[in-house]
Curated annotation (Swiss-Prot):
Condenses 4-methyl-5-(beta-hydroxyethyl)thiazole monophosphate (THZ-P) and 2-methyl-4-amino-5-hydroxymethyl pyrimidine pyrophosphate (HMP-PP) to form thiamine monophosphate (TMP). This is Thiamine-phosphate synthase. One of its GO terms (molecular function) is thiamine-phosphate diphosphorylase activity. The keyword Transmembrane helix does not apply. The gene is thiE. InterPro entries: Aldolase_TIM (IPR013785), ThiamineP_synth_sf (IPR036206), ThiamineP_synth_TenI (IPR022998), TMP_synthase (IPR034291). It comes from Methylococcus capsulatus (strain ATCC 33009 / NCIMB 11132 / Bath). 4-amino-2-methyl-5-(diphosphooxymethyl)pyrimidine binds at Q43, Y44, R45, P46, K47, N75, S114, K144. Its cofactor is Mg(2+). Belongs to the thiamine-phosphate synthase family.
Length: 224
């Protein structure tokens, strides 16, 4: 089912991404704690398990996020996002186009694009109507140990060229999140730094505390 009441994507904050190992009640409890800690958006990232379980967990997550007033994004699959009634989808390089995702989800759905270390890919995604882009991995990642690395310099340049929100991902925790925020990231995306913590709400709160007042509009290079 298509969601008829999509929530907007946040302009800044913590982007909490659920790990595949959490399912059922454990997934819901951890996600609720992340939201209580201040997460601005949650991404559901199921990579294994029966399709029926992914669907039922996703529906419960969507209900939780909707009650909290924050968007739920589904990783990789516009079809699963539509079945759940999620607010949007996050696409990697092999997951299809912005237009294809909107055909499944509707024109008001959130569509985010992984851009790795490619500013060109990010500019193209923005031109195609993406709601946000993500760069990474900025640091060694336990979730994706073989992921290619992105540079802080790419974040800095993206901050002067893009008007849509920029998320940073990959090995981000409280020791380095300040670097990526300072380099231009509007959101920090985290899996283990949040859901691997003994106190999920506290971990989320500590990451959220690194954000300051909303930024003014970023200048484009052609504004001069």
């Amino acid at each position: 089912m298509k969601n008829s009441m999509y929530l907007p994507f946040p302009s800044k904050g913590l982007y909490a991404i659920t790990p595949d190992r959490l399912q059922g009640d454990a997934l819901l409890a951890a996600a609720e704690s992340a939201i209580l800690g201040g997460a601005a958006v949650v991404q559901y990232r199921p990579k294994s398990g029966p399709a029926s379980d992914r669907l039922s967990d996703g529906i419960r997550l969507q209900e939780l996020c909707r009650t909290a007033g924050i968007p739920l994004i589904v990783n990789d699959s516009p079809r699963l996002a539509a079945e759940i009634g999620a607010d949007g989808v996050h696409l990697g390089k092999n997951d299809g186009s912005v237009a294809a995702a909107r055909h499944v989800l509707g024109d008001r759905a959130i569509v985010g694009i992984s851009c790795y270390d490619s500013l060109e890919r990010a500019l193209r995604a923005e031109a195609e109507g993406a709601n946000y882009v993500a760069f990474g991995a900025l640091f060694p990642s336990a979730t994706k140990p073989c992921a290619s690395r992105a540079r802080l310099e790419t974040l800095r340049e993206a901050g002067t060229r893009l008007q849509i929100p920029i998320a940073a991902i990959g090995g981000i925790d409280t020791t380095n999140a300040g670097q990526v925020i300072g380099a231009g990231a509007d959101l920090v995306a985290a899996v283990e730094a949040v859901f691997g913590a003994a106190d999920v709400a506290r971990a989320a709160r500590e990451l959220c505390s690194l954000f300051h007042a909303p930024r003014k509009r970023r200048p484009r290079c052609d504004d001069a």
